[in-house]
Amino acid sequence: MSPQTETKANVGFKAGVKDYKLTYYTPDYETKDTDILAAFRVSPQPGVPPEEAGAAVAAESSTGTWTTVWTDGLTSLDRYKGRCYDIEPVAGEENQYIAYVAYPLDLFEEGSVTNMFTSIVGNVFGFKALRALRLEDLRIPVAYVKTFQGPPHGIQVERDKLNKYGRPLLGCTIKPKLGLSAKNYGRAVYECLRGGLDFTKDDENVNSQPFMRWRDRFVFCAEAIYKAQAETGEIKGHYLNATAGTCEEMMKRAEFARELGVPIVMHDYLTGGFTANTTLAHYCRDNGLLLHIHRAMHAVIDRQKNHGIHFRVLAKALRMSGGDHIHSGTVVGKLEGERDITLGFVDLLRDDFIEKDRSRGIYFTQDWVSMPGVLPVASGGIHVWHMPALTEIFGDDSVLQFGGGTLGHPWGNAPGAVANRVALEACVKARNEGRDLAREGNEVIREASKWSPELAAACEVWKEIKFEFPAMDTV
């Protein structure tokens, strides 16, 4: 036997496979203020103990692999490994558990949502020992929060830029989402803005198609904004979607928007990717642009209650990556959103400090310190009859976005915008007078419609429209 072979043998390295729980299940571990904490909903395969399943998640999302390797001896696994420190059964579910995992902060690159997700969810979701796995929540430590810029501007700066206070902001997605020429698209924008909306919006899949190239759309929308501002005396905006096939093209579009002098651009942050989104957010802060975020593709990731990533995690990630608005569901419209859970992640978007509250799906106390907040956007199947509920549920710091609920008005876009603005102002006035919008909302709308024919027509059109289906999500 050669001396080199003898040296390897004397190290004491023992090859083979051993249970993850021997190394990565540590119920006595006391979490540190600097740890990133994760709550996973774990559904083990039959015969796999929950401790082994939780430990496998901790291992495969940090330092572990399927077998012992000799290079483990070249570093301090105890310093760098993830730890499953607690497991609790899910009430009412068979063989399903919440596994809590702590990750040392040194595992993550500063200021990179991309790296954080690559580590925590990048590989473990295909693990054979698990039937299903869902990331329910993350606790981001202050030490890591401070490595991110976050939203380009935040709620208060946006209000100051727009000179709009004391009420939710009103928006509208231009429909049909695809097929309009740039000039007709700009005309629709102008009609909505002059009628009383604060914003109009590109739909998420409006990029630069043959029927409407991005530069033409940007120019005609800018013309519409300036014309509506001159007529109304209010600051207006249109979410110009800068999402593109490459980061370079995305930045070219954002730069052109800045040159036009418009106040806001837009990005599809999940399909575009976190690296692109963070790059755009930094540019927007440096150049005075607001950034509207659409969550296209989120339901592919978050809708199944046993597998994937809950939207509250995607919302936290967006606040870190950067965005001034993000779509958050409506509770009352056509897209899914259970009230308490939706308001849980709305608070995670807006507030500085959010206490743990399992009844709202918040597994960890989250301190955002000085990071600006994000305005939640309620959009999808809403109309004037929903205005009291939306005002009561979301409060002033929100954007209420009516696409079909504006453009579907029987008299046209501008009257549709008037109807929404009148309904909103009536609801805010009633709330400020101490009226209960949850009980008196319909009466508030009826009273306002007596002096607004535009609102009366909208009330008649949508009086029978409801979207009532059971929610998929559970706490």
Swiss-Prot record:
Pfam families: RuBisCO_large, RuBisCO_large_N
Propeptide segment residues: 1-2
UniProt cross-references to SUPFAM superfamilies, sorted A to Z: RuBisCo, C-terminal domain, RuBisCO, large subunit, small (N-terminal) domain
Site entry: Transition state stabilizer: 334
Annotated GO biological process: photorespiration; reductive pentose-phosphate cycle
Cofactor annotation remark: Binds 1 Mg(2+) ion per subunit.
Location(s), subcellular: Plastid, Chloroplast
Classification via InterPro entries: RuBisCO (IPR033966), RuBisCo_large_chain_AS (IPR020878), RuBisCO_lsu_C (IPR000685), RuBisCO_lsu_C_sf (IPR036376), RuBisCO_lsu_fd_N (IPR017443), RuBisCO_lsu_N_sf (IPR036422), RuBisCO_lsuI (IPR020888)
Gene Ontology, cellular component aspect: chloroplast
Modification(s) after translation: The disulfide bond which can form in the large chain dimeric partners within the hexadecamer appears to be associated with oxidative stress and protein turnover.
CDD domains: RuBisCO_large_I (cd08212)
Active site residues per record: 175, 294
Residues engaged in binding Mg(2+): 201, 203-204
Catalytic activity of the protein: 2 (2R)-3-phosphoglycerate + 2 H(+) = D-ribulose 1,5-bisphosphate + CO2 + H2O; D-ribulose 1,5-bisphosphate + O2 = 2-phosphoglycolate + (2R)-3-phosphoglycerate + 2 H(+)
Gene Ontology MF terms in the entry: magnesium ion binding; monooxygenase activity; ribulose-bisphosphate carboxylase activity
Keywords: Acetylation, Calvin cycle, Carbon dioxide fixation, Chloroplast, Disulfide bond, Lyase, Magnesium, Metal-binding, Methylation, Monooxygenase, Oxidoreductase, Photorespiration, Photosynthesis, Plastid
Keyword set includes Nucleotide-binding: no
Role noted for this protein: RuBisCO catalyzes two reactions: the carboxylation of D-ribulose 1,5-bisphosphate, the primary event in carbon dioxide fixation, as well as the oxidative fragmentation of the pentose substrate in the photorespiration process. Both reactions occur simultaneously and in competition at the same active site.
Subunit description: Heterohexadecamer of 8 large chains and 8 small chains; disulfide-linked. The disulfide link is formed within the large subunit homodimers.
Other remarks in the entry: The basic functional RuBisCO is composed of a large chain homodimer in a 'head-to-tail' conformation. In form I RuBisCO this homodimer is arranged in a barrel-like tetramer with the small subunits forming a tetrameric 'cap' on each end of the 'barrel'.
Family note: Belongs to the RuBisCO large chain family. Type I subfamily.
Protein name: Ribulose bisphosphate carboxylase large chain
Species this chain originates from: Ceratophyllum demersum
Name of the encoding gene: rbcL
